[in-house]
Amino acid sequence: MKKREIKKICLLYLQIIVFYSIMVSSMRRGKHHSKKKGELKIIKRANPFGKKKINRGSKSHSLLYLKNCELRNSGRRNTHLRDLFDHLSGGQPLRDSNIEEYHLTPKLRKTVQFFQALPNDPYRKSQEVILLGRKCPPMPEELKNRGCQSTVYVHPTVEDREGKKIIAWVGDSDGLLTKGIVYILVDGLSGYPPEQILRVNPNFITLTGISEFLTMSRINGYLNIMNKMKAFSTSIMQNGER
């Protein structure tokens, strides 16, 4: 009897040990599997879009860089324009935004204030310049002024008003933007004596914002027209003094 009981007890212990080992191994497998799932979930939450998320970040970064680059380039362009105007306009430097410092005629002052009241949008301002150019009457070809990207016509006439010489200007051009600039000058400087025309600082164009979208050739053409108008005004003054 004792031997049989001992065998039964041994078998029972063996069954318990086997069952316990099976349970332990299964529990370990379950924990390992659940841990992998947890890791996968964490990875998916951290980067749900995979590579697309990285691409979006790099794209926004590149756009930000381009925007900053444009701002830096615009600053350099403004500095270059100031130096160019200072060099080509007879050493008349740019001053503050105070309009009084430019000795403008009443017509030019009105034009500057008109463009300053517009939104700071180069396209909008360029369209306004083109619209002003439509007011220029046609002119004969023999009156053209060279030195600009487009063919330009500028012609003065002198009138005597109460013993004073008054200059009137007409102008035209085959370029849309240049034609508008010609109109600004001939309209703004017509009806005034040569002394008043000579006092006008040609850098006033920077107050309007027009110079921001002009090419270098058009800027040179603008200053060439101003130089011709001032040269004629000087000759009128010299002839009047003789």
UniProtKB/Swiss-Prot annotation:
Entry keyword annotation includes Metal-binding: no
Pfam families: SufE
Family annotation (InterPro entries): Fe-S_metab-assoc_dom
Active site, UniProt feature: C148 (cysteine persulfide intermediate)
Pathway: Cofactor biosynthesis; iron-sulfur cluster biosynthesis
Protein localization: Plastid, Apicoplast
Domain of life: Eukaryota
Any single Gene Ontology cellular-component annotation: apicoplast
Keywords, comma-separated and alphabetical: Apicoplast, Plastid
Keyword Transcription regulation: no
Family: Belongs to the SufE family.
Biological role: Participates in sulfur mobilization (SUF) pathway for iron-sulfur (Fe-S) cluster biogenesis. Enhances cysteine desulfurase activity of SufS. Probably functions as a sulfur acceptor for SufS.
Complex and partners: Monomer. Interacts with SufS; interaction enhances cysteine desulfurase activity of SufS.
Name this polypeptide is given: Cysteine desulfuration protein SufE
Lineage: Eukaryota, Sar, Alveolata, Apicomplexa, Aconoidasida
